[in-house]
């Protein structure tokens, strides 16, 4: 049994060594550029925005999940949500994506599926909430709070979340600057 667990654990892709540099990420995982660029073009979402939100949500960890609450220091409680994988998509939202796109076999721990989901969600947010696809700050707020929560302004009482959204915007700007050096075609096409 332990051997099966070890074999399964070794199948998870490790996060990039330098998650703060888009060029380093794509040098380490070349297929991630292909998948990210495809999602960017398919959903008309700037690649730096996709990367910055994924950086914040999971730090590019395939097996990311929200932290549990612990009781008495050793009894694990439930997780606060069903968020999982690179995109931290909730079960219901992930299922909506799978149905809407016909990608019924999509997995949240597969980078290609997760980045495509994020493009789809940002596209939906742009349509529903009228947030520009390149507006990393407001797109992140809507990503975190949900499209309905954003519309109701649920983020306004959460200064910590607005600060986090500001960091996402800054990270998107850094990624954009980096990508102009290593993949200029990825930032000039949108």
Task: Pin down the residues of each PLM region.
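Sec-dependent signal peptide recognition
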Residues: 1-2
């Amino acid at each position: 049994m332990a051997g099966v667990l070890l074999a399964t654990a070794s199948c998870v892709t490790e996060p990039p060594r330098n998650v703060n540099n888009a060029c380093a990420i794509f040098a380490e995982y070349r297929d991630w550029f292909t998948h990210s660029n495809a999602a960017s073009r398919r959903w008309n979402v700037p690649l730096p925005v996709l990367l910055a939100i994924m950086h914040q949500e999971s730090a590019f960890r395939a097996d990311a999940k929200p932290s549990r609450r612990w009781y008495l220091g050793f009894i694990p409680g439930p997780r606060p949500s069903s968020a999982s994988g690179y995109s931290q998509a909730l079960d219901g939202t992930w299922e909506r994506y799978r149905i809407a796109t016909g990608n019924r076999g999509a997995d949240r721990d597969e980078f290609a599926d997760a980045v495509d989901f994020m493009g789809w969600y940002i596209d939906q947010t742009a349509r529903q909430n009228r947030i520009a696809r390149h507006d990393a700050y407001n797109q992140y707020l809507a990503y975190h709070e949900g499209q309905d929560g954003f519309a109701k302004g649920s983020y306004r009482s959460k200064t910590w979340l607005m600060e986090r959204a500001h960091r996402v915007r800054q990270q998107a700007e850094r990624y954009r600057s980096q990508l102009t050096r290593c993949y200029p075609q990825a930032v000039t096409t949108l």
